Amino acid sequence: MSLDYCLMVTGPAYGNQRASSALQFARALLECGHRLGTVFFYQDGVHNANRLSAPAGDEVDLVRAWHELAQQHQVALHVCAAAALRRGVTDALQASLLKRSGENLQPGFELSGLGSLVQAALGCDRFIQF
């Protein structure tokens, strides 16, 4: 039986295992034939959407890995706008509105509100937080 999943990632790209574990879990459930509709990045998890992140050559590039997963499997990557702006992650529109010199949101990620999280959670069979 195939299930629809939604993930919420609250851990940063680096510093603890939550984001890495979420990515590994996402890959595993897709390999098993399940569907992953949305990954919502909240709290420190918004750092997973910072395109300026530059890990060492021997580390997994989680930002690009999430992007690749989303492209390959049509997964929506939503980033809590309030949490992102608070932590210095912004898209071009918000940077312009806030009179900042540039944006750093990785392509493939989208700033959104908690309403997107609620919609995703209501539309899936399993909701898992990392």
Swiss-Prot record:
The active site is at C80. The keyword tRNA processing applies. Its main location: cytoplasm. It is an enzyme of class 2 (transferase). Its EC number is 2.8.1.-. It is found in: Cytoplasm. InterPro entries: DsrEFH-like, Sulphur_relay_DsrE/F-like, Sulphur_relay_TusD/DsrE. One of its GO terms (biological process) is tRNA wobble position uridine thiolation. SUPFAM superfamilies: DsrEFH-like (SSF75169). Pfam families: DsrE. One of its GO terms (molecular function) is sulfur carrier activity. Keywords: Cytoplasm, Transferase, tRNA processing. Transmembrane segments: none annotated. GO terms for cellular component: sulfurtransferase complex. Heterohexamer, formed by a dimer of trimers. The hexameric TusBCD complex contains 2 copies each of TusB, TusC and TusD. The TusBCD complex interacts with TusE. Belongs to the DsrE/TusD family. Part of a sulfur-relay system required for 2-thiolation of 5-methylaminomethyl-2-thiouridine (mnm(5)s(2)U) at tRNA wobble positions. Accepts sulfur from TusA and transfers it in turn to TusE. PANTHER family: PROTEIN YCHN, SULFURTRANSFERASE TUSD. This is Sulfurtransferase TusD. It comes from Sodalis glossinidius (strain morsitans). The lineage of its organism: Bacteria, Pseudomonadati, Pseudomonadota, Gammaproteobacteria, Enterobacterales.
